[in-house]
Structure formats: C-alpha cells, structure tokens
C-alpha cells in the first residue's frame, strides 16, 4: 500500500499530514501480514507520480513484480495521469469493482477487473461523513473509528 503525500489531480488544501495518515494505515493493517505500508513517496519531489513510484520500486526490488490497483471510480480519470501510457505498457492495471454509476473513461483503458465483492465504502464517503460530523463506526476498523472522529482536523 503506497501512501502518497499529494495526488497531482487533487488539491492538498484539506489533507491530513502524511505522518497521521501513515499511522492510521499502520493501525489498520497491523494484524495482516500480507499488507505493508510503503512510504517511499514521502521523500519524492512533489507532486509524486505513479510511474516514478513504480519505476523506483522496480529498481529497489528487481526480483518482484508489481501491479497498479485502483478503484473503478478512479478509472475514468486514468488517462489524465502523467505518463499513463507508460504505466499501461509497463505494469498490469487491476481495477477493484465499485458501485459506480459515473461516466466511462474518455479512452478505453485495458485493465483486469478484480474478482472481488463490491464494497460501497470509499475513502471519499468516510471523509465526507467525518467532515459532516457523522459517525464512521462500522465503516473503518474499530481500532480507528474513534481516533478519526476525535481528531482536531475533523472537529474544525
């Protein structure tokens, strides 16, 4: 799981600091040996671009192969990503299914749809509920829900 300090297609104005987000991810995945947080982008110049990260990881771990996994809702803007053609030609693109009724991608994007249950919970939903002062209990692991809700960032 690669944590990005700043998505080039989004404003960083309303974003928690990198360390807080990293800590929350570590808390959530601590009991799963198959998941690991990667903070390599923290030291990259901003904005960080996916193709640079994948190239860097390939150089660090030449005996490993990597795929890019993103949510189906993100596929519509994939052709806006910097060097998206390089990504498509160099790494497999896997897409996690979402209940998504938005527009189709502007250009066809070859990808593999992961065979997984559709989960209606998204980071966008969680951020929206926190910003509105609504509970996120049962949407995130128990170990995290109170910490998130009580964080000064969400209490204004």
Where are these regions (language model features)?
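Nucleotidyltransferase catalytic core that binds NTPs
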Residues: 1-156
């Amino acid at each position: 799981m690669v944590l990005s300090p700043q998505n080039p297609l989004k404003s960083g104005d309303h974003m928690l600091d990198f360390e807080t987000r990293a800590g929350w991810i570590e808390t959530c995945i601590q009991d799963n040996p198959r998941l690991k947080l990667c903070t390599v982008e923290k030291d990259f110049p901003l904005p960080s671009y996916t193709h640079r990260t994948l190239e860097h990881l390939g150089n660090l771990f030449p005996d490993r192969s990597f795929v890019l996994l993103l949510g189906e809702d993100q596929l519509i803007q994939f052709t806006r990503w910097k060097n998206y053609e390089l990504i498509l030609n160099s790494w497999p693109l896997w897409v996690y299914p979402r209940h998504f009724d938005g527009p189709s991608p502007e250009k066809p994007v070859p990808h593999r749809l992961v065979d997984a249950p559709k989960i209606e919970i998204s980071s966008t939903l969680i951020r929206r509920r926190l910003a509105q002062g609504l509970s996120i209990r049962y949407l995130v692991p128990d170990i995290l829900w109170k910490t998130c809700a009580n964080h000064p960032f969400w209490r204004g």
